[in-house]
Amino acid sequence: MSLPQNLSATPSSPSETPSHQVKIGPHTLATPVELAPMAGVTNASFRRLCREFAESALPEQLRPASSGQIPYDGGLLAPAGLFVTEMVTTRALVERNPKTLQMVRTDPTERLRSIQLYGVDPNVTAQAVGILVRENLADHIDLNFGCPVPKVTRKGGGSALPWKRDLFKSLVNAAVQAAKAASESRDFEVPVTIKMRIGIDDDHITYLDSAREAEDAGVSAIALHARTAQQHYSGSAQWDYIGTLKRAVSVPVLGNGDIWVGDDAVNMLATTGADGVVVGRGCQGRPWLFADLVHALHGSPERTHPDLAAVLEVIRRHADLLSDEIGPDRAIRDLRKHIGWYLKGYSVGGEAR
């Protein structure tokens, strides 16, 4: 895959930049798509698989010539979007928990190392951000205010935290300031973003106040899952909230919720005015969704309709990546849940099974 030289350096004119792009701090997403952080799912192997599908669908002028990072316009270029790690607990990172340290060691082929943090203590969050930035472990840091899982919200974290406005402001401000201070040793300032829901429930809608406070604190973008914490993943995402948020803030807004096919992303951007989309459950067992997203967002009519044989090849590729990352035994255990997702809707028996 080849990348024109002008995409490896600061462009001399706007016409040389990709037309479908969003800026996250100093970084450029040439395709406005983000793989959502998902616990137990978005490890390095799955992120790489999704990115491989996404980059295979890029227009010729955006296809990278090699793996790894692409300096561009004072930051980094992510041709096919952003692929975020699993949620990392700030305290575990500060305490140098071995499993957590493994989670933040990203694939060396990644274009832009994006790590999501979860925590409820501003001081610990600042320390965790400092570690990631000073030790050159991340190029982008996202803060989790969207997790609806009870074991997280019961502690006042995740999607319950924005209701505690003073704590929310302290956490975001601590992260942004820590990133700025630690970035002095880096070639660019590592941006901090947030991901949140519209509120705890219909009686406790928090997203607009939280977004304005986060923007004032200096975040570089805001992702909104258009459901309440109470909804978890039930019902339909209420995209109109994304549009309201976009009109309320000046930083980029990424919409999340009910992106199942490539055309859903196009529709979300058209109906909400959002700058990009975040994809979660829609890609479980369907990493080729990222090829369809790239095709759709760059105006190509091509879509992916894999038969069972093609799906089995994807499973093999996924298994190989996992085996290299965590060893064959753990890879087999990790792959089991993915196989159930992969084979949903297919009649499987005999040799394939």
Region annotations inferred by a language model:
Residues G25-P32, R91-L112, C147-G157, A182-I198:
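N-terminal small/glycine-rich loop or linker at the start of catalytic domains
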Residues M38-G40, V88-T90, Y118-V120, G146-P148, ...:
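Active-site beta-loop-alpha junctions enriched in small/polar residues
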Residues L7, E16-K23, M38-E135:
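Glycine-rich, positively charged N-terminal anion/phosphate-binding segment
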Residues M1-L29, V33-E34, A39, S45, ...:
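Alpha/beta catalytic cores of nucleotide-metabolism and tRNA/nucleoside-modifying enzymes
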Residues V33-P37, F83-E86, R113-L117, D139-I141, ...:
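Hydrophobic faces of well-ordered beta-strands that scaffold small-molecule active sites
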Residues L58, N123-G157, L161, R165-V251, ...:
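Alpha/beta enzyme core
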Residues E55, A80, L137-A138, V219, ...:
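A structural motif
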